[in-house]
């Protein structure tokens, strides 16, 4: 994840993300959130470095990650990478996956990355940036999700609906360097497993 962060032009830490940033010697460009996961010592450290900090109330509709994404979109981001947004809190992890759709609906490319997975969404043809042998799970987001055709997968999917209650798209395997998936309708959540 440190390599991913180093390739970013602008880093917004959502609350507790600053703990990861300081551990990995990465200075964020901005810190946002209700700041309930940051010690006063850490806040003071970043204030002394003149890093902008935007504090929000604890009682709010948006998560701290949602706020960070909104700011990134307002700043004109063309691509958003959410680091560490998959963790012990399944509710936050699921919420962050749903935020990928919000970002994509704005026409911005986005992915959610942790040590083991890269998660992204699409509702149109997508070319995969992965190596043969990588595991790819293909999950529908909602009803009426249909794949027109796939290329470069061990288990091809051709003109098939992906039922929300029968996840047959789990653990497919990429077989070609130029793999792609042509989505006919609906949104799909892709999980690329890093092993």
Task: Give the positions of each predicted feature.
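Acidic/Gly/His-enriched mid-domain segments of enzyme catalytic cores or analogous surface patches
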Residues: 4-10, 16-104
């Amino acid at each position: 994840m440190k390599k991913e962060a180093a390739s970013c032009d602008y880093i917004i830490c959502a609350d507790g993300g600053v703990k990861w940033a300081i551990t990995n010697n990465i200075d964020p460009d901005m810190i946002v959130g209700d700041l309930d996961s940051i010690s006063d010592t850490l806040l003071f450290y970043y204030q002394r470095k003149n890093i902008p900090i935007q504090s929000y109330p604890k009682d709010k509709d948006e998560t701290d990650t949602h706020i960070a994404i909104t700011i990134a979109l307002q700043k004109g981001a063309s691509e958003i990478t959410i680091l560490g947004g998959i963790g012990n809190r399944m509710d936050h992890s699921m919420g962050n996956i749903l935020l990928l759709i919000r970002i994509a609906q704005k026409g911005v490319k986005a992915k959610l990355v942790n040590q083991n997975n890269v998660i992204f969404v699409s509702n149109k043809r997508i070319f995969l940036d992965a190596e043969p042998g990588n595991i790819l799970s293909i999950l529908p987001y909602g009803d009426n999700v249909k794949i027109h055709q796939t290329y470069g997968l061990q288990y091809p999917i051709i003109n098939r609906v992906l039922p929300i209650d029968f996840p047959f798209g789990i653990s497919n395997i990429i077989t070609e360097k130029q793999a792609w998936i042509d989505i006919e309708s609906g949104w799909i959540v892709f999980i690329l497993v890093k092993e």
